[in-house]
Amino acid sequence: MNYNKKSIEDIDVKGKKVLVRCDFNVPLNEGKITDENRLVGALPTIKYLMEKGAKIILCSHMGKPKGEPKKELSLLPVAKRLSEMLNKEVIFADDDNVVGENAKKAVEDMKDGDVVLLQNTRYRKEETKNEEVFSKELASLADVFVNDAFGTAHRAHCSTVGVTNYLKEAACGYLIQKELKFLGNAVEKPERPFVAILGGAKVSDKINVINNLLDKVDTLIIGGGMGYTFLKAQGYTIGNSLVEEDKVEYSKEMIDKAKEKGVNLLLPIDNVVADKFDKDASPVITEDQNIGEGYMGLDIGPKTAKIYSDAIKSAKTVVWNGPMGVFEFKSFANGTIEVAKAMADSDAVTIIGGGDSAAAVNILGFGDKMTHISTGGGASLEFLEGKELPGIAALNDK
């Protein structure tokens, strides 16, 4: 895939109507935004376009309204908060059909530097099916398209891909540019040693990632729920731990592939276990890899955490996707904390692949110590799998 795409700095936007696909899919509680990270992430692109005298038309989805208007998934709270952040009124075009009379009038009345926000694109059933009719309507409002929503770059929807069929100029915003730079370099030309850490519950979610990364990394570290499937593949007992029986054979193949490729594959050598999945369960540390009857693994053990941390300390590039244990439960958060600490203390390029690991790093207060925290869980995974991301492929090449 070609990651060398035109950015907003490569196009003349003065006086032009610029449709910007943002990721404003933020959590709401009673109409209040509880996590503003995604809004903050969009500001550099919006501010640049304002300074350059563009007419800025923002669009995004929120949640899964499944093709019909749902008041609780309206982008009105986003328009209000953005107005405060930009010190400028963001006009909210509240049309249930997204491109309706309000949107058309708001866009018609725009002066250079003005900002309009359209209603939730997923109010339209055509959006997720990438149907022409809605793509055309969105494109009809603008002269130029800018995609700055990395979180949905792996989806071919009207607002990410379809509009590019009708707008000649299509470039990426600063957020996607940054994602492409860091993730692209990690996958294409990493500084070595290159260490990848994969956690989370399921091997099946990460099958292609494991396979692709074994061709690229020097060390692959595996923790989290998926570690138990690998332990079973090595012949250890895993008690009542999470396991994917149908992936045991695949895990054996990956262990063999790592040997073949000369990749240092690190798996747990001890575990923190409990007799139930509960935040108040008593943690027990195992002597070795084996987990006894009636117990389930809920975190990597201290010896494992030390080995993983040492591997991170000697790395020049580290990519992490997925926690090492049930970090929401205090007694089983230590593995994730140790990995995050080792990355925070490292002078390597450290990249967090969105989703749960990003949440963990931010909760632990290490966010500002990382080189880059990806804004897209699913998109960053597909990127690490080596897949082409439709929302990026559709933009103009440099």
Curated annotation (Swiss-Prot):
Pathway connected to this protein: Carbohydrate degradation; glycolysis; pyruvate from D-glyceraldehyde 3-phosphate: step 2/5
SUPFAM superfamilies assigned: Phosphoglycerate kinase
InterPro entries, per the entry: Phosphoglycerate_kinase, Phosphoglycerate_kinase_CS, Phosphoglycerate_kinase_N, Phosphoglycerate_kinase_sf
Binding of ATP, residues: 206, 297, 328, 354-357
Keyword Amino-acid biosynthesis on entry: no
Catalytic activity as recorded in UniProt: (2R)-3-phosphoglycerate + ATP = (2R)-3-phospho-glyceroyl phosphate + ADP
GO molecular function terms noted in the UniProt entry: ADP binding; ATP binding; phosphoglycerate kinase activity
Domain of life: Bacteria
PANTHER family assigned: PHOSPHOGLYCERATE KINASE, PHOSPHOGLYCERATE KINASE 1, CHLOROPLASTIC-RELATED
Protein name per its UniProtKB record: Phosphoglycerate kinase
Organism of origin: Clostridium botulinum (strain Hall / ATCC 3502 / NCTC 13319 / Type A)
Top-level taxonomy: Bacteria, Bacillati, Bacillota, Clostridia, Eubacteriales
